[in-house]
C-alpha cells in the first residue's frame, strides 16, 4: 500500500512535468482571452461534472473573491451550484441540458465559457459548448486523454488545454494547477504588482 501511495505521487509529478512542457502556451492564450473578456465588461461562465464541477466552482470563487492579491471582484459564474435550477432542468428536459439552458439565459457575446471535462465527452458540457457558440461566446476547454468530442467543437478563436494523460485523477490534479495559473495570470495582468512584494 505504501508503494502504491508513493507511485501516485510519482505519477502526479511526472504528469505535471509533461504538462509543464505541453501547456504553457495554451494557458497563456486562455488567460489573455479571459483578461480581454473581463476588460470588455463581460463575464466567464464555468461548468463541469463531479470533480470538474468542483473545479468550475473553485475558478469562479477565485475570481469573485480573490486569488493571491487584493483586488476588486471579477465576474464569474459556476453553472453547477444552483441545485433548484439544475434539478428543474434535469427533471423537465434532460440532464444534458443543465448547463446549456443557463448559458442561453445568461451568456452574451464576448463572454467566455470555461468547459471542463477530463474525457472531453461529457454530454452536458458538449451541449453547453454548443449553446455558448450560439451566443457568440468564446470557449476555453480543459480536457485530457484525446480531447474527446469537445476538441472537435472548438474553432480558431477558442483554446483547448489538454492534459497529456489518460488517468482521470492525474488530469484533475493538473486541471486544478491550470486554474491556479489562469487566476494568477489574470490577476497579474489586470493588477500588476511590485515583484518585490
Curated annotation (Swiss-Prot):
Cofactor: Zn(2+)
EC number: 5.3.1.28
Biological or metabolic pathway of the protein: Carbohydrate biosynthesis; D-glycero-D-manno-heptose 7-phosphate biosynthesis; D-glycero-alpha-D-manno-heptose 7-phosphate and D-glycero-beta-D-manno-heptose 7-phosphate from sedoheptulose 7-phosphate: step 1/1
Enzyme class: isomerase
Cofactor note: Binds 1 zinc ion per subunit.
Binding site for substrate: 49-51, 62, 91-92, 117-119, 122, 172
Catalytic activity entry: 2 D-sedoheptulose 7-phosphate = D-glycero-alpha-D-manno-heptose 7-phosphate + D-glycero-beta-D-manno-heptose 7-phosphate
GO biological process: carbohydrate metabolic process; D-glycero-D-manno-heptose 7-phosphate biosynthetic process
Alphabetical list of Pfam families matching this protein: SIS_2
Subcellular location: Cytoplasm
Keywords of this entry: Carbohydrate metabolism, Cytoplasm, Isomerase, Metal-binding, Zinc
MF-aspect GO terms: carbohydrate derivative binding; D-sedoheptulose 7-phosphate isomerase activity; zinc ion binding
Residue ranges occupied by any SIS domain in the UniProt entry: 34-196
Gene3D superfamilies per UniProt: Glucose-6-phosphate isomerase like protein, domain 1
UniProt function note: Catalyzes the isomerization of sedoheptulose 7-phosphate in D-glycero-D-manno-heptose 7-phosphate.
Subunit structure: Homotetramer.
Note, other: The reaction produces a racemic mixture of D-glycero-alpha-D-manno-heptose 7-phosphate and D-glycero-beta-D-manno-heptose 7-phosphate.
Homology family: Belongs to the SIS family. GmhA subfamily.
Entry protein name: Phosphoheptose isomerase
UniProt source species: Shewanella sp. (strain W3-18-1)
